[in-house]
């Protein structure tokens, strides 16, 4: 399975935006145009996020596949209403940024 760090970052941005608005809209239920717009926003965000300090092995994970799976699990839990927006962002962003830093060779 290929894990797209940009899509995961877009999903994190979606969690932040909809969570702040008091909504909880699953990624899959967004119109394709909205998903594409969030993905473009995420790609543009990478320049600013590169200066932020994130751990290289969040939650003790080092393998890109494990990092991506953990991020996806957090996002899925948020969509099901099992995780708060703040918790999802606090735990998910370090995971996604570690995956982004792993580069294309880190994408299984």
Predicted regions located by residue number:
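Hydrophobic packing residues in well-ordered alpha-helices of helical domains and bundles
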Residues: 38, 64, 88-92
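Short, charged, intrinsically disordered terminal tails
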Residues: 96-108
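Juxtamembrane/membrane-water interface recognition
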Residues: 18-21, 40, 102
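Amphipathic alpha-helical oligomerization segments
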Residues: 2-26, 47-86
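Short, charged, amphipathic alpha-helical segments
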Residues: 32, 85-96
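Amphipathic alpha-helical segments that form the core helices of the histone-fold
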Residues: 25-50
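A broadly structural signal marking compact, well-ordered functional cores
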Residues: 1, 89, 105-108
């Amino acid at each position: 399975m290929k894990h797209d760090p940009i899509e995961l970052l877009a999903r994190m941005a979606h969690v932040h935006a909809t969570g702040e608005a008091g909504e909880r809209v699953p990624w899959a239920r967004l119109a394709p145009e909205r998903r594409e717009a969030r993905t473009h926003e995420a790609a543009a965000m990478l320049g600013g996020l590169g200066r932020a300090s994130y751990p290289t092995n969040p939650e003790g994970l080092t393998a890109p596949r494990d990092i991506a799976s953990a991020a996806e699990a957090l996002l899925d839990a948020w969509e099901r209403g099992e995780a708060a927006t703040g918790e999802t962002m606090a735990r998910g962003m370090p995971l996604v940024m570690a995956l982004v830093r792993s580069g294309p060779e880190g994408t299984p």
